[in-house]
């Protein structure tokens, strides 16, 4: 197993727009000394840049307005039977709006519809809605026990990776200011400000393409497993160019909040539009409202029949060519 430590941040002014990622100075320069004095574990990913707050607030308001008017259509349904349905959640809509409209599209007045999985506001793709409390409990248990296989696809702007496939294990938790951060794997179980604990998270990444060049044509190496820990950074990037378009496929083993987004930030390939985690907001003359992350596939055993099910959502425009 390799040891990996990587720091990423952005330079910005009060009125700047995020246009490209930068390698960072050590995170300890950004942390308040009081947190260190209390012996809390130190996050090893950069905090959200100040400019992201206003952008995220505006996006949230726009999503609330859009969600209030949202209704599922038959074209959004990817799979359905008497126990559950899978839908293709659009970008920029809250999960609750999708759940609210589900009974209407199937002409069912039942109040037992539940979200089996949740997607971030700007993440699109496969979302499962159960039709009874009993089925919901079974699927939640399956997700918790990592029995459901998930794959996502993301478009990132950052430094060209020199790896083809890598599994990243780290800690996950909220820093004292409430932001989700990456922590060292050795910190799992330690107490955080506010009384929560560092929890484990693990994601496997595969490079799909770099600047539209397919994986098979890239001169990349397989890296078996990287444990995020204190120590020298052994998983390096392929060059000094920090404006490379990298499409990756992600397979999260755990299901932590913002997990893929955090690990992409940590690896130096933040997701395009993901300003909270240092993704570019403006790039090549365009602005991007929301991050480019799509839940493309869920594979599971049916909670009632036991049949194997593979549910795929159509790829968004930015991934369709990959």
UniProtKB/Swiss-Prot annotation:
It holds the Pfam family PseudoU_synth_2. Keywords: Isomerase, RNA-binding. It catalyses: a uridine in RNA = a pseudouridine in RNA. It is an enzyme of class 5 (isomerase). SUPFAM superfamilies: Pseudouridine synthase (SSF55120). The active site is at residue 120. Transmembrane segments: none annotated. Its EC number is 5.4.99.-. This is RNA pseudouridine synthase 1. It comes from Arabidopsis thaliana.
């Amino acid at each position: 197993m390799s040891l990996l430590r990587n720091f990423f941040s952005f330079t910005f002014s009060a009125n700047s727009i995020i246009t490209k990622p930068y390698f960072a100075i050590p995170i300890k320069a950004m942390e308040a000394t009081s947190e260190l004095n209390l012996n809390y574990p130190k996050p090893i990913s950069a905090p959200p840049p100040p400019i992201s707050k206003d952008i995220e607030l505006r996006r949230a308001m726009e999503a609330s307005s859009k969600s209030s008017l949202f209704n599922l259509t038959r074209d959004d349904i990817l799979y359905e039977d008497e126990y559950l349905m899978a839908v293709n959640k659009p970008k920029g809509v809250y999960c609750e709006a999708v759940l609210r409209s589900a009974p209407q599209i199937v002409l069912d007045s039942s109040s037992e519809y539940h979200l089996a999985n949740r997607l971030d506001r700007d993440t699109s793709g496969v979302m499962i809605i159960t039709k009874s409390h009993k089925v919901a409990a079974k699927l939640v248990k399956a997700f918790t026990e990592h029995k459901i296989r998930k794959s996502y696809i993301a478009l990132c702007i950052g430094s060209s990776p020199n790896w083809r496939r890598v599994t990243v294990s780290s800690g996950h938790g909220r820093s004292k200011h409430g932001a989700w951060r990456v922590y060292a794997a050795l910190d799992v179980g330690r107490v955080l400000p506010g009384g929560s604990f560092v929890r484990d998270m693990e994601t496997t990444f595969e490079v799909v393409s770099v600047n539209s060049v397919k994986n098979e044509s890239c001169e990349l190496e397989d890296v078996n497993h990287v444990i995020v820990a204190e120590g020298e950074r052994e998983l390096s990037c392929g060059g000094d160019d920090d404006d490379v378009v990298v499409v990756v496929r992600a397979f999260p083993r755990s299901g932590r909040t913002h997990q893929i987004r955090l690990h992409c930030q940590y690896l130096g390939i933040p997701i395009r539009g993901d300003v909270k985690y240092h993704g570019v907001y403006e790039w090549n003359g365009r602005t991007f409202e929301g991050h480019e992350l799509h839940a493309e596939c869920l594979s599971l055993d049916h909670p009632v029949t036991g049949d194997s099910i593979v549910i795929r959502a159509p790829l968004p425009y930015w991934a369709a060519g990959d």
